Amino acid sequence: MLAAVFICLTGVSQPRFSKENEQRAAEIVSQMTLQEKAEYVGGFEDWYIRAIERLGLPAVRMADGPQGVRNNTKSTLYPSGIAAAATWDTDLIHQMGIALGQDARARGVHILLGPGANIYRSPLCGRNFEYFGEDPYLAGEIAASYIIGVQSQGVMASVKHFAANNQEYARHSVSSDVDERTLHEIYFPAFEKAVKKAEVATVMTSYNLLNSVHASESKYLNYDVLRDMWGFKGLVMSDWISCYSPLNIATWGVDLEMPSPICMTPELLVEYVKNGTLAEEYLDRKCQHIIQTIFAFDFDKRPQLDKSIPENNPYSDSVALEISRGAIVMLKNQDNFLPVKKGNFFVCGPNAGKIVTGGGSGFVTPIITSTVSQAMTSIDKKVKATVISDKAKTKIDGMYADRSMSIPGVSVELYSNVNLEGEPVSRYVSDKVFLSGKPAEAHEDVVASRLSSRHTFYFTPEVDVTYVLKINGNDGCRFYINGELKDSAWGRDSWQYITTEYDFKAGHQYEVVVEHYNRGGTNGLELIFDSPVLVNESEAEKIKAADCVVVCIGHDNTSEKENHDRTFELPKEHIEYLRSVLALSDNVVVVLNGGGGIEMGSWLPDVKAVLMAWYPGQQGGTAISEIITGKVSPSGKLPISIEARLEDNPSYKHYYENVPRMRVPSINPYSRLEYREGIFMGYRGYEKNDVKPLYPFGYGLSYTSFEYTDLQILQDGREYVVSFNIKNVGKVAGAEIAQVYVTDDECSVLRPEKELKGFDKVFLKPGETKRVSIKLGDEAFRFYDLNRHDFTVEPGSFTISVASSSADIRLTGKLEVLAIDK
């Protein structure tokens, strides 16, 4: 059970947009000078809306989310967004929002840059872990609960990234080409619910283009949909460095350019207004939106920093633990191997001894750490655990910049183009393979956002040594050893991660060359030397003797992160480690980390159990150990479908690896990703294509069983109430997530076989029965009509399915929907 809310904030009214606040804002705008307006629509010192003291406008501070308040200090690290969705528990996610709001107030933060509400389209997207899964209804309900919680504490939430940001590949230059119906039925609803149900304060646009127009300057997104269709009253901000055309941004683009006025510079805006290119009313409108949002939260009337809230808030920690408990999905439990309440445990694997999380702006350094190895040994002192120490380093002894090995370091050549063409414009020696931004040694012609580089060093080991060479680079990278290409991610145009294991022989000289280019965005490159993950002799004996071997593997912040699409497969060294353990034991439980689907077919038949732990936050180790030992019954269910093969995913043929990249600037300066699967993505697509996923949407095992009975469907005005009984027929307490799907039995347009339209998480003691009621309104039966450019409901027969997962229907019934008067 959650502890009571630690702090009850005083003096903070429920945030609201009102005519009074709009009028106050208009009065302030009327007093602003043109220069002040031009400056106000650009960020200040990277993380602020600037203050205008003479008008009583405060500085407004932002911080990254959404897994915690990322503020250059330690903070509570919550489970990732996809883990939050896996709880299917809106009450709990509301508590998460409250806790995040308190964390923000404890640090004086006004705007939390979260949640992320993009839809999971493919397992490859590097930021899936931040989002709420593949279903728009589930994502919308989780997002709204999160936002309402955050904003109840006097902190603005910022729902992101609007819209169709479903890949990190080439995110500055890729156009998500999505048809109108698919946008409104799949990719818009979570944002719509954030606006209409949660009254979110701010919306952040995405880096990508939507149908050939950058989101940050799209009139369709920022005005036609957000404001005219949904009635949004708040402010729209850009993602960091995602504004491209000054005049387009100034007219129909975002209200606020972050992190600073790089595109909409004050000088340019003032010039545009004075020469008649831009009407001043456009700036008035942007300032109006920003100021009325500030007034809605009373930021001008109270301090945001609340010193009565500790940064290490016990309530926040308890919420993080409860979410982790509810998020973990048990995918496999052969012969009821789990729970193992007594016996000889051995805990191992690359992720056993560390807090595992995704990378990028969602990365948070936790205040408290509970790893799996720590938690398992604290539960039972007899538990043996091996923590694989981090032996990674960015430089090794004996690196030389020349073949004669007289100059220590790495030879670096920089080019003022992205193709390593012509002569390098800068040459220098570095102590390692590393770039961040524009190097101090770079020639003035080098632009960090458009360059290429070659890094060369020579190495003669004194003894045989094996290194796992890992390269992170933006946008493309590749490397050679003695002239032979060893790995490449060239031409992908996003942050890349490549890795190769190589045996270096004593006395042999090796030439290592790393090449890289950056076509846009943040420039970065790093070569890491790591050691292979191996089972040593001591571990082997413990593995053989153990009744239960817990192997912790998966992705982390190096392989799954912002600005980088990941692989469907696990890191190679993790797979090799698991195989070495499986050669020694038949009693293996795999704890998986990741933000989505992972290839499992090569090892799944050989393990006893699999727990999908996602990125479980700072208390993840505790929750995992409690489930393994039976103190908690697993209750999470998949907010995604997990495919057996990547090729099975409905978007596979239309994701980047199968779409030609067009890069002729005079014709098309960006890539086009056509969402040809349309509305048939996720479980909708698997069912239409008659493809069985490895694990279906809504699936998750428990230590107990549940029985569904007595379905009733009653009409209540314009709503229908679907009610039924759920009984815990097992011997332990547990929670079941009942799911209600709706099928349109006959429609004038092609619709999915069924769609999720309601759910409830029900906690039951052994033998206990509860009556569950779920209401279905117009939203449950509608589809987007392209002729009307609006949603419509066709009268007729609908099938109601009550299910334990999308593939496990327990009860069905029928209802008739009559014509609905608009």
What are these regions (language model features)?
Residues 1-8:
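Bacterial N-terminal signal peptides
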Residues 8-468, 472-786, 792-806, 821:
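Glycoside hydrolase catalytic-domain context in secreted enzymes
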Residues 808-822:
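Short beta-strand elements
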